[in-house]
Amino acid sequence: MIALRLEGQAMEIEGTKFGSITIDRKTYEHDVVIRLSGEVIKRKKKLSKKYYGTSHVLSKDEAKFVFEKGCEQFIIGSGQMGNVHLSPEAETYFAKKGCKVLLQPTPDAIGVFNKSHAKKIGLFHVTC
């Protein structure tokens, strides 16, 4: 299911626990990506899993899927225990796009996302 947001409407990530994240009073029981528009979509983990056998390494293919022109910040919630990280190719991709990457455990990344006024995209891993 895709949640849409009205232009200029503030989004709030209320919290996370192992296996879920709550955004604007809706709980998602899977990893999510929050687009520049505020649209919440399911993360396409298979784009990374096909290369690394795990979704804990973000591939260049997944980076290309997630990135949108105009994005200033890519905030990654790396899981409850911080297991997700970028592949070297994904790091290079975001650097070439001029997009600052902030990677923190999901509970901390939520606070960063909520406080940021940048044009941002979020990816939140909800398990380990």
What are these regions (language model features)?
Residues 110-128:
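Short basic, glycine-rich beta-strand/loop surfaces that mediate nucleic-acid
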Residues 61-62, 108-112:
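Short acidic active-site motifs
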Residues 35, 77, 123-127:
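Short beta-strand segments
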Residues 100-110:
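A short glycine-rich beta-strand->turn/loop micro-motif centered on a GG-aromatic cluster
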